[in-house]
């Protein structure tokens, strides 16, 4: 029924739009080059009331739809160029008026203070990426980065917070163009501690070019944080309170000062988060039936601070530095209960294991960037980055394992364990990128050298039941050191062929030297280091063709690599209880993906993309039985022989009426996972998945803005073998601005019907497991934001050079 309503609403929206008129054109400068992302506004000729606002795309093209018949004039604004006007425009019923090429003139003065702000589309589809514009969406209030990723088009977040794009795992996560060296629980904690109010947009780059690192077989997700874009002294403050079963609160601020010599900017925030995650599992293993319930609560406090300065050294040179620091401190308590009984008679309970965990965690991160940029203002640029990042995590966990009889009245036995697992990761990087014109096109090249040093200590303690003394278990404790060096270089060339064809081709090479050294506390358990030394080549190419006016095709092909996250290489046993644990695999190979994408764009707005990828040695998460204890199972990582994915994505922004705008996104994929590990451990999984997402924005009376958004996800597969069932969610929001739009008050409700959970099953290697989970997803939030200061001129945006490595740390 939900799917039928969605399709009916889509048909109605398209029908309603078809009755209106449209206006389109192309913006170019005096030399005939496209003017991209210029602000465009259409006014009524009678009273100069603005009717519609937009922006030009990558080719300088723009289109205004949903217009009524009448007389208008158009104004286009771009920094450094004189304002452009097109007057005496008359539209009749159902007319599509093409203004052709509109040319700007150079400007010798700054823009006037009166500017027109163009509202961005929720999702922009470009040749190489999809941009999810978060800033300004009401339903992002009180949310966090992880929740926003669940809503992002083509993105899936599974029950263990693993992220995939169009069914492909191995996503590289960036923040402001810099790789985030975190994985696993550490990454989840970071994303949960990053308020949505600090996020400007999320860029999903499914097929990056040679300039980008080859890491990440599903591409790159780049979370772009807000940064004030104005000259002078200005800033903002935002405070949010959110209530579900537990509360969340945060306070965030930005500041910016710019003059002719330098630009200084800063952002910062503090937050407090409480939440829960409840899971329920039934497992059948070695003729034993286990029913497990795990209810966990997490309470954390965090802060983050970001400051930078750009010095303008002459007309063409900029020297800048950027510092990021953050800390997240959390306490996690969980109640874990497992009943054990014969598989034939599940009701005849043999014993019950109670394993209530308590953990204290602290995650600290610091990154430093020094940047030099040369730009001659025409065609030649040089960018150099020096980066250093430090990520330190500590975790102390106390875990009693107590076995009771079937009525939980008699303690049969107990075994108390404790864990101390500090991690220290250092990342060093230097990179340079150069671009210039050549042979009627543009050539680019560069290099990057990265060194990652990871020191992971895992100390396992047996706790004496009588006196509480901790005794280190040398057989289960270890130190894992990982040293990885990557030397990369690339070249890329692009040019236009006539007015309808554009092509680009690139080649990147990466030399990887990595050593994983597991140091044990008992000499008889010591194994030699695992050494990996390989050279890889990553070609890519793309071509775009304007088939006809308002019809364009884009074809992209490429090859990528995904190296294992640092934490999944460590083979220590990270226990949830004596019967359930995780352990890494130091022999994991990098996975290689070859992919091809074909995109079609209609009227510069409606987009269809079809992709096909083949991944060899795909790194996947599997649940397997323990070799020694027939009751126990563990989670580990292994390489699949092959994964094939056929994917599709459709996006359509629609203006239904003057006061009602909508966005629709439909994505689907077919996934085929294959592997044979011997002894009957076979992976042979084929599944379909689809996700329907839509957002509706309403301009209401009394200057109110309303928002309704929701998604429906069909069944699919997580990792190699876990088949999940469908789920859906609905969000509501309301916004009102005051004080000349400087004060913004927002109310929102997330997952109103509490359906954003998960259920599923896996059947692998003689072990069948099914279960589900829920978290604190239904929330009600209120937010207040205030902007102050001068808001006229833009400041420079830039990123650092270690985002890719940071994505593998696991924070």
Language-model features, listed with the residues they occupy:
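Outer-membrane beta-barrel signature, preferentially recognizing the C-terminal barrel domain
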Residues: 357, 478-484, 532, 561-609, ...
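Face-selective signature of the C-terminal outer-membrane beta-barrel domain
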Residues: 304-328, 357-518, 546-550, 606-610, ...
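Outer membrane beta-barrel strand-and-loop segments of large Gram-negative receptors
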Residues: 293, 418, 427-431, 471-478, ...
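Periplasmic plug
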Residues: 125, 162-207
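Transmembrane beta-barrel wall of Gram-negative outer-membrane proteins
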Residues: 246-274, 278, 288-334, 363-366, ...
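N-terminal periplasmic accessory domains that precede
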Residues: 101-103, 145-147, 187-191, 204, ...
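Short, acidic, small-residue-rich periplasmic hinge/interaction motif at the N-terminus
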Residues: 39-43, 77-79, 96-138, 158-160, ...
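Short, acidic Ser/Thr/Gly-rich low-complexity loop/linker segments typical of extracellular
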Residues: 45-61
């Amino acid at each position: 029924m939900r799917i039928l309503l969605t399709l009916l609403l889509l048909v109605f929206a398209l029908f309603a739009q078809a009755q209106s008129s449209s206006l389109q054109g192309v913006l170019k400068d005096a030399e005939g080059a496209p003017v991209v992302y210029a602000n465009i506004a259409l006014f009524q000729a009678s009273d100069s009331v603005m009717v519609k606002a937009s922006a030009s795309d990558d080719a300088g093209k723009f289109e205004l739809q949903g217009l009524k018949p009448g007389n208008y004039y158009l104004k286009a604004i771009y920094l450094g160029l004189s304002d452009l006007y097109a007057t005496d425009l008359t539209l009749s019923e159902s007319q599509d008026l093409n203004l052709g090429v509109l040319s700007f003139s150079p400007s010798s003065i700054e823009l006037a203070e009166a500017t027109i702000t163009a509202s961005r589309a929720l999702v922009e589809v470009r040749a190489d990426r999809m941009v999810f514009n978060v800033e300004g969406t009401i339903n992002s209030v009180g949310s966090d980065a992880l929740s926003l990723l669940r809503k992002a088009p083509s993105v899936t977040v599974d029950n263990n917070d693993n992220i995939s794009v169009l069914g492909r795992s191995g996503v590289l996560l960036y923040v402001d163009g810099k790789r985030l060296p975190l994985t696993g629980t550490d990454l989840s904690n970071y994303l949960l501690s990053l308020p949505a109010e600090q996020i400007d947009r999320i860029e999903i780059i499914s097929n990056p070019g040679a300039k980008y690192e080859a890491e990440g077989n599903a591409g790159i997700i780049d979370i772009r944080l807000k940064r004030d874009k104005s000259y002078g002294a200005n800033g903002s403050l935002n405070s949010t309170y959110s209530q579900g079963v537990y509360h969340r609160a945060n306070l965030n601020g930005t500041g910016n000062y710019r003059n002719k010599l330098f630009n200084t900017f800063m952002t910062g925030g503090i937050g407090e988060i409480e939440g829960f995650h409840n899971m329920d599992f039934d497992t059948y293993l070695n003729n034993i039936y286990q029913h497990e319930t795990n209810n966990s609560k997490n309470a954390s406090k965090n802060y983050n601070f970001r400051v930078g300065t750009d010095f303008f050294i002459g007309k063409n040179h900029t020297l800048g530095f950027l510092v990021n620091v953050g800390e997240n401190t959390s306490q996690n308590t969980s109640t874990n209960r497992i009943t054990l009984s014969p598989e034939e008679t599940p009701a005849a309970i043999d014993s019950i294991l109670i394993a209530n965990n308590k953990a204290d965690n602290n995650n600290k991160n610091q990154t430093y960037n020094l940047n030099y940029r040369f730009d001659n203002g025409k065609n030649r640029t040089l960018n150099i980055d020096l980066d250093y990042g430090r990520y330190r995590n500590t975790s102390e966990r106390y875990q009693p394992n107590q076995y009771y009889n079937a009525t939980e009245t008699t303690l049969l036995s107990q075994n108390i364990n404790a864990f101390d697992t500090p991690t220290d990761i250092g990342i060093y990087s230097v990179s340079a990128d150069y671009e210039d014109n050549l042979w009627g096109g543009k050539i680019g090249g560069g290099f990057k050298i990265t060194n990652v040093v990871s020191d992971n200590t895992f100390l396992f303690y047996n706790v004496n039941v009588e006196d509480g003394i901790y005794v280190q278990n040398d057989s289960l404790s270890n130190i894992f050191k990982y040293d990885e060096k990557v030397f990369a270089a690339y070249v890329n060339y692009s040019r236009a062929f006539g007015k309808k064809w554009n092509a680009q081709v690139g080649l990147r090479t990466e030399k990887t030297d990595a050593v994983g050294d597991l140091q044990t506390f008992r000499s008889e358990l010591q194994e030699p280091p695992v050494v990996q030394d390989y050279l890889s080549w990553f070609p890519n190419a793309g071509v775009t063709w304007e088939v006809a006016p308002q019809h364009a095709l884009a074809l992209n092909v490429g090859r990528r690599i995904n190296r294992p996250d640092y934490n999944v290489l460590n083979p220590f046993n990270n226990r949830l209880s004596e019967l359930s644990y995780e352990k890494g695999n130091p022999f994991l190979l990098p996975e290689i993906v070859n992919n091809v994408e074909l995109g079609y764009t209609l009227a510069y707005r409606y987009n269809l993309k079809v992709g096909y990828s083949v991944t060899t040695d795909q790194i996947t998460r599997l649940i397997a039985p323990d070799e020694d204890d027939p009751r126990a199972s563990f989670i580990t990582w292994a390489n699949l022989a092959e994964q094939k994915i056929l994917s599709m994505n459709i996006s359509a922004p629609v203006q239904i009426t003057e006061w009602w705008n909508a966005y629709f996104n439909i994505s689907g994929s077919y996934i085929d996972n294959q592997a044979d590990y011997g002894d009957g451990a076979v992976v042979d999984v084929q599944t379909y998945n689809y996700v329907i997402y839509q957002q509706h924005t309403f301009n209401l009376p009394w200057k109110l803005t309303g928002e309704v958004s929701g998604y429906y996800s069909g069944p699919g597969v997580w990792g190699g073998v876990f088949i999940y069932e469908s789920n859906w969610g609905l969000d509501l929001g309301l916004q009102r601005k005051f004080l000349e739009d400087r004060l913004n008050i927002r109310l929102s409700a997330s997952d109103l019907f509490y359906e954003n959970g998960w259920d599923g099953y896996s059947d692998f290697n003689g072990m069948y497991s099914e279960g589900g989970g829920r978290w604190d997803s239904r929330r009600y939030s209120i937010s207040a934001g205030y902007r102050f200061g001068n808001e006229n001129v833009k400041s420079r945006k830039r990123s650092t050079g270690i985002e890719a490595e940071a994505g593998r740390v696991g924070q």
